[in-house]
């Protein structure tokens, strides 16, 4: 077997069903091995390396399972690096297989095709686990090691590189078996009991959830019910608690409740807004639940740190929390939500379009946001009913991530509709992947809100820089004809009612992408509801 065949056999043994990729001479033996694997693993080729990497990211976010992409070295790796950074920031299990120049030439500066100075060093700054496959018998063990690292502690991406001549080297064939997952760390019963006592004695508890809570939705719901604690989610935590639950809240009301809270239980979240914007003081006890032992003390030492998988920790907390059944806070929170909705009414243009999307998207459909005015508002206003159905780019918040990421989600979850929202600026970062969607018959709906500008940048220039507008106005194609030229379905919607009708038609497509262009003007700023000042203590 060749090194590449060992690698593909290892991917299959570990349940990898798809490799998102863009081929090139450095990886020719790898693609030959993928061909020989037949239907056991599918190769989805894209039109740009960032498309392959973002598709793997979208598939990982939508399924919670590890995904793989393959690219050539040097420019191929660097073209995919924005997606790799985003995967790191979102703790997404994405494995990159990256080619290399001939092994004997690595680090010698000969000027080989796609040579890059210290590629391994660059990779090591982007991910926590990386390695080079140096001979055939290393391929399967290193893939197993990488996948194990990606799932241990804080999840995240990994990179394996392999020289072009090593991919084709051979060794005696042998069977490949999946490696056992890393054992879960034992629960710290003393710390859990301490946390349970604090929660049981609390008068105004608040739960904040991030992406690390997505697989503990039932446990979050039960603990929230027992404590009558509101659950705040922003971006990746959306959907952990169904938005229809009166205890489910978003950022603006969360800040008010942060000011009142005596105990905050933070589950799988960096707690960035609380520590850096809203402030802390001696009266606030913070309990951190995180898979990463370094995370709880990154900003400040918590009252209690619970390290491990959120699911068993929260289940145990719910069992141990003392005290009598608490009075319902549903009526109180519903009233406060209504007051907050009145304040958020200034975002009516965005809200109208988001309501149209929510009305047509099934409960289990997937919504992929973008760094655009509709996307910012969606993080505050869009109802989300289940984990992994609201995909948002985390702290990288990188423009242009959305369409290709949604394409990966749509490929991995062909059983549900997927809608990508984009601005005219961000969409053109990866709009060439319409060709990928058509070629592979992926039914994705993208809604392009066209205001003829990098709208957020333009508003900042108008409001904060004396209307000195520069480099923010855009000249765009006819998006409908542009999409149709790829073979996609396309139409234009001018208001929320027309958008609903267009979405209804789009979601009936099961083997073709659809683009819906929505011409819009400038929209009201959401930032007063996102970057909110301190409400207690010190930041």
What is the predicted role of each segment?
Residues 3-8, 12-14, 22-25, 30-35, ...:
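Active-site diphosphate/adenylate-binding microenvironment
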Residues 49, 161, 370, 433, ...:
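Acidic-residue sensor for enzyme active/binding pockets
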Residues 105-114, 226, 255-258, 296-299, ...:
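Thiamine diphosphate
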Residues 137, 173-175, 202, 283-371, ...:
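Phosphate/pyrophosphate-binding active-site segments
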């Amino acid at each position: 077997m060749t090194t590449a065949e060992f690698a593909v056999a290892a991917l299959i043994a570990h349940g990898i069903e798809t490799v998102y990729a863009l081929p090139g001479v450095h990886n020719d033996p790898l693609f030959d091995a993928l061909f020989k694997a037949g239907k056991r693993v599918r190769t989805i080729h894209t039109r740009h390396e960032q498309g392959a990497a973002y598709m793997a990211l979208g598939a990982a976010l939508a399924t919670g399972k590890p995904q793989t992409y393959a690219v050539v070295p040097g420019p191929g790796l660097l073209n995919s690096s924005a997606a790799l950074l985003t995967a790191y920031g979102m703790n997404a299990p994405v494995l990159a297989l990256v080619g290399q120049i001939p092994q004997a030439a690595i680090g010698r500066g000969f000027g080989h095709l796609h040579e890059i100075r210290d590629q391994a060093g660059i990779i090591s700054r982007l991910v926590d686990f990386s390695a080079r496959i140096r001979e055939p018998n290393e391929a399967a063990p290193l893939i197993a090691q990488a996948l194990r690292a990606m799932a241990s502690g804080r999840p995240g991406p990994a990179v394996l590189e392999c020289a072009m001549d090593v991919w084709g080297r051979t060794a005696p064939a042998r069977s490949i078996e999946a490696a056992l997952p890393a054992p879960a760390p034992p629960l710290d019963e003393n710390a859990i009991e301490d946390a349970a006592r604090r929660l049981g004695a609390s008068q105004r508890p608040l739960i904040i959830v991030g992406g690390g809570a997505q697989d503990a939705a039932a446990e979050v719901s039960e603990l929230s019910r027992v404590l009558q604690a509101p659950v705040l989610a922003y971006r990746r935590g959306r959907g952990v608690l169904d938005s229809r639950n009166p205890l489910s809240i978003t950022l603006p009301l969360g800040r008010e409740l942060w000011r009142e809270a005596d105990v905050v239980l933070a589950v799988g979240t960096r707690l960035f807004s609380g520590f850096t914007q809203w402030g802390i003081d001696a009266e606030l006890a913070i309990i951190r639940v995180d898979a990463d032992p370094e995370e709880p003390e990154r900003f400040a030492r918590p009252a209690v740190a619970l390290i491990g998988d959120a699911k068993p920790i929260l289940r145990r907390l719910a069992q141990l929390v003392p005290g009598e059944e608490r009075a319902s806070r549903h009526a109180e929170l519903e009233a406060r939500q209504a007051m907050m909705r009145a304040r958020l009414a200034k975002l009516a243009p965005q809200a109208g379009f988001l309501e149209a999307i929510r009305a047509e998207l099934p409960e289990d459909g997937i919504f992929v946001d973008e760094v655009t005015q509709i996307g910012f508002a969606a993080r505050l206003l869009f109802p989300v009913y289940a984990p992994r159905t609201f995909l948002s780019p985390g702290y990288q918040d990188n423009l242009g991530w959305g369409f290709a990421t949604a394409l990966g989600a749509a490929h991995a979850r062909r059983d549900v509709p997927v809608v990508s929202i984009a601005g005219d600026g961000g969409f053109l970062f990866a709009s060439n992947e319409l060709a990928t969607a058509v070629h592979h018959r992926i039914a994705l709906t993208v809604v392009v809100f066209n205001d003829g500008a990098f709208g957020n940048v333009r508003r900042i220039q108008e409001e904060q820089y004396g209307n000195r507008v520069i480099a923010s106005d855009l000249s765009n194609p006819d998006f409908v004809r542009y999409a149709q030229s790829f073979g996609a379905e396309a139409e234009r919607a001018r208001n929320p009612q027309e958008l609903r009708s267009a979405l209804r038609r789009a979601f009936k497509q099961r083997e073709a992408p659809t683009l819906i262009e929505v011409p819009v003007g400038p929209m009201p700023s959401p930032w007063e509801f996102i970057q909110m000042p301190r409400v207690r203590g010190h930041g």
